[in-house]
């Protein structure tokens, strides 16, 4: 083909031919899912073009939320969000190919794996002081503590209700 500029670039189903120039990209950016498809208008037109139904509208809503969150919080965009975006684009391209859309499919090689470093194990070592205070909370078996507990139990009023009696029997270990 001839790239002399005589022919305008061909736009995809969700991309305008010439993107608008925006002064403030946060407040003036058009939503990517509102592009009309085949003469239909409304916010679900793009979802209907992807195959319609609840699945299309859910994916368009989630893409809207993800796109708006990256505009509002640009510092959050990092390696994890890029990996999520590439996984999301790969999953949406596979669903569009099932519905017969003319949108090009992405290959599986476009999904990049982000290597995570060795994570510290949560079950072994490193938490030496985590359970140290439990030994201090243990019931003491010295005679003074046992006598004090016994006198406090005797001074308590007799339980009135069925559940209170059942609880006391359970705690004491006696059968009803």
UniProtKB/Swiss-Prot annotation:
Disulfide-bonded cysteines: none
Region (Disordered): 1-66, 79-162
Low complexity compositional bias, start-end: 79-99
Protein keywords: Conidiation, Differentiation, Sporulation
Gene Ontology biological process terms from the UniProt entry: conidium formation; sporulation resulting in formation of a cellular spore
Name of protein: Conidiation-specific protein 8
Source organism of this protein record: Neurospora crassa (strain ATCC 24698 / 74-OR23-1A / CBS 708.71 / DSM 1257 / FGSC 987)
Gene: con-8
């Amino acid at each position: 083909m001839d790239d002399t500029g005589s022919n305008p670039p061909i736009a995809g189903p969700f991309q305008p031919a010439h993107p608008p120039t925006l002064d403030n990209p946060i407040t003036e950016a058009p939503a990517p899912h509102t592009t009309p498809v085949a003469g239909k208008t409304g916010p679900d037109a793009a979802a209907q073009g992807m195959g319609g139904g609840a699945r299309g509208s859910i994916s368009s809503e989630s893409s809207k939320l993800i796109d708006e969150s990256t505009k509002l919080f640009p510092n959050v965009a990092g390696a994890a969000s890029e990996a999520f975006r590439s996984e999301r684009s790969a999953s949406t391209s596979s669903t569009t190919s099932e519905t017969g859309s003319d949108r090009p499919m992405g290959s599986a090689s476009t999904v990049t794996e982000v290597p995570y470093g060795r994570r510290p194990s949560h079950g072994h070592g490193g938490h030496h002081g985590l359970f140290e205070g439990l030994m201090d909370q243990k019931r003491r078996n010295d005679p003074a503590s046992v006598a004090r507990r016994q006198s406090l139990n005797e001074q308590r009023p007799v339980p009135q209700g069925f559940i209170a009696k059942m609880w006391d029997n359970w705690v004491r270990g006696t059968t009803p």
